[in-house]
Amino acid sequence: MLTIDQYVRAESLEQAYELCQKRNHVVLGGMLWLKMQDRKVGTAIDLCGLGLDRITETERAFELGAMVPLRALETHEGLNAMTQGAFARSVEHIVGVQFRNCATVGGSVFGRFGFSDVLTLLLALDARVVFQGAGEMSLEEFCARPPFRDILIRVIVPKGTEGTVYLSQRNSATDFPVLTCAIARREGAFRFSIGARPGRARVYRDEKGLLAGGITRDSAQAMAEDLSRRVPMGDNLRAGAEYRTKICQVLVRRGLLKLEEVR
């Protein structure tokens, strides 16, 4: 059972940041995972009054507030036009619409869960994150850092992507993914993000120049084989490492060929 001693609706980001520095204080997101935990929370910090539930479009990027629900990513015309529907595909298997109306971008990103579809896609898109204390950094850098206590304010998704694809393999439609794969092309360069390994998503690049001559069936297969050798896989209840390695090769090849179609 989750027990909360004190509830505070933060009046400012400064107040929320100060409160979250204490070890037994917790920031509330959608509370979908938090409520399932057996723990005692000293102070629950609610950010819902700070205007972080908006998606803002600027000349160079889309800015996603930390309290934006995942459902908004699924239905936002601008985000999905820029990514050829990848945002909608990245969340469509996450339980159901009611769940996605509650789950937040901030919870998905700050939690850095291995099974996170959203994190996989945002890494491929070279997103940046902005914190109250630590300031702005790349999402890739944040994922490599050890845990720290801070308030995530927003996620910045830069424009200019020439094509984006998101794919996942699941044992059943609304289950956690066995493997996730996102590919984005920008200025001729490719970013591959592989998640649910079952560890958190990581970014990979075409280090050998296998796609320098463009995407063909042969180059896509070569890139898929290269990545399947480079991405470390593990075992859990949903799949073994060997199976994930085979699935990785399939998803990368399919993703590249699909990326060429939407060019």
Indicate residue ranges for each PLM-predicted region:
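C-terminal structural segment of proteins
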Residues: 1-263
